[in-house]
């Protein structure tokens, strides 16, 4: 039957339709003639050239507006918009100016500033590259815009660029065409029109369209069965329609706009580092000012050349303090450790696109997971067959294993017995032949790649896979071997017959039939369709016990329909009935009247199977305190059934609408959720497990609500429809088989589409964060030691103990390698048995900060002590008194004059200080193998990377001492006696930390554990966004 609307030029009466300057917004709820009248278009002739010009002026071109990318110079400047970076920049500039003012050469004065600038440029480069990659998400949407389209203009069909389409155009679409713009269906020229709109709605099945009005003012995309959406694909049928939305005023355009307005989300670690940076900058400023002020009375020291020169001298010390206090290597170490973590995750098919998302995974409290292709395989499979066993109305059920499009699986008979030759069973043999012949899909193995290629609807592909699992009866001896992997059974049946006629699937008949002529010249009709409709056309049933075709009785009919209902209610299976009949050889055409007197073959139960790993993955999430919410475009019953199969819902769980009030609110449709209003929505998320029939905006709203309640939200998805929610979530997770848009909008891509991979990624995220805390603490304590050394030297009036360039070398190179290696500390065994950490958990709490302050003070004191020891106590050193050392500026006026001043130019004391600083920090790195466990329990070789990093750092340190680089850093080689003192001063740091670890273990009567996820909804105020229906703040009591 052809579905159409009456043609002719509509009157230009006032249609009363809604007009928002963007075209007709309610075309789905309007008659075709009303839509045509709105756009003043003749359904038989289309728009005229003049109409097209006017429409283009009014609506613009059918293109998404290009986003203005951020200029490169702005991206570069953005990387320097950080408080610590600004302090370092200021220190570099001031250091250069002072060096030049004191008569140093430009080359000499540039060394320290250039080192600082190179560090900052390296970090900025990484930031710019990362942000440039993020902009690709918007551009990827263009791949879903059709290139060309067939339109009716001036009474003639024309092929034009899709960008030239305007609202009001009549477009013609056929199988394989991509819909160029949002279109109201006006004519369907085939018995059915099916659209694959999974990229927009997430529906796993192609959707059948029609021309009738949809009487539903709140219809979501899935309900608008008379609308074709831009970017979706025609998989069956031919039709015409009126374009009602172009460019950004399409469903996909609105998704793109939602992506475009997303703001950068600060991850928990980034927020903590920002807070730490702000605090550190204040501390640095205070210390620098304090050092400068404390030494004001020394500005007039004659040895410094006057008050102004004295002020400059102590200002240089303040600059050195700033350099010492800032952990310059921290950004690089954090980036390196996260990058190394991503490499490990990539080996397990979790491909991370943005480094901060690694850390965010560790504190995820909610995963909003798409069903199709994420929790399920997105590969329909026949898993049940029901047939009439005998004329006594007894039914026999068969199970079919295998849950993918790969033709591997077994057939189990009643009682679970494996059938070695399934096709020798009459009903299965006929079912396989019907599945192969009454089928328009194609499945084949590509010769070049060896991969399975498929064309057509997933239901029909599942039938081909089913036929392959059944195989051929043993009575048939094919001319050549049948290869299951090459779909040999399907090929045999197709080559054995000639298709003579086809009755396509239609909405009113709900079945499809083909007429074929076999090699034996026998003509047969093979039919498939909805069981209740096929049964009406049947007069006989194929008995499975060898009786052949027996009359279909009322008892048989009732038994078949009862089995169908059981399939649907128990496992939410989609049921399909198969039938056939032989016709005279003179029959060469098919008519609807031929679909009668059929012989019923059997029922097939099929579904989109859950991934086998999902149940255990969801169990792990539960143990780890992570809530999983299924969010899908499929219907409510199917979604709930899958939720039960993967363990998200228990089989006994009562759902919305039941009498059990304690279990209400577990499952909602998108419309039910939307109609609740802000108060109801926020309350519903507490127990929500399944949200079905959703649109993109529902996903966004869900993410907003969860984030407002303090949750750290991960959203998984694979379609264009998921992209805005992926961007809005704290971490977006796309499937590897998903669309390019989803992948570029996501923070992480699952290469194997395996939900279990998410669990591994979450665990790895927790490990990485714990290790990140360890090396951050290590670097903080090291920097505290450097600050203490500079501050103490300034207070005591000592010569320059460490120069800024030496401090930079220690911070970046010798400290950086062990800090990075700490990222490889082993995970705690109960990592996934604890709840997620709270976002506001500090990296360093009060007690830990006190511990590292003590360590830092020890580091600073022994660094200065080594310096003093060389001048006063070392026989081969300065051999001077304390007074001479602290009044080094007056050496020229002392006995010996210039000769005595030469000792203050020796490189040995500063080299000893630098070496003590390096070695003590290597020992301190060992302290950070664990927060509280002793080195006696966790030996250094437990982290071989750390041992290697310490060895490398020491080798680099020896390198600058005993090579030509010593001049650049102002150091020199040390004697055995000097190295002995360095070790004596450095090693006790382990004893100091062991004492504090023991005290820490004593004060913790129970092992430290996570405080779990977010606070209860009953305890918080929930701020609402502008998208909420209620504008007031919400407080649940």
Curated annotation (Swiss-Prot):
Its EC number is 7.2.2.-. SMART domains: Cation_ATPase_N (SM00831). CDD domains: P-type_ATPase_SERCA. Gene3D superfamilies: Calcium-transporting ATPase, cytoplasmic domain N, Calcium-transporting ATPase, cytoplasmic transduction domain A, Calcium-transporting ATPase, transmembrane domain, HAD superfamily/HAD-like. The chain crosses the membrane at residues 83-103, 109-129, 276-296, 317-337, 398-418, 731-751, 790-810, 852-872, 945-965, 971-991. InterPro entries: ATPase_P-typ_cation-transptr_C, ATPase_P-typ_cation-transptr_N, ATPase_P-typ_cyto_dom_N, ATPase_P-typ_P_site, ATPase_P-typ_TM_dom_sf, ATPase_P-typ_transduc_dom_A_sf, HAD-like_sf, HAD_sf. It is found in: Membrane. GO terms for cellular component: membrane. The keyword Transmembrane applies. It comes from the Eukaryota. Keywords: ATP-binding, Magnesium, Membrane, Nucleotide-binding, Phosphoprotein, Translocase, Transmembrane, Transmembrane helix. PANTHER family: CALCIUM-TRANSPORTING ATPASE. This is Cation-transporting ATPase CA1. The lineage of its organism: Eukaryota, Viridiplantae, Chlorophyta, core chlorophytes, Chlorophyceae. The gene is CA1.
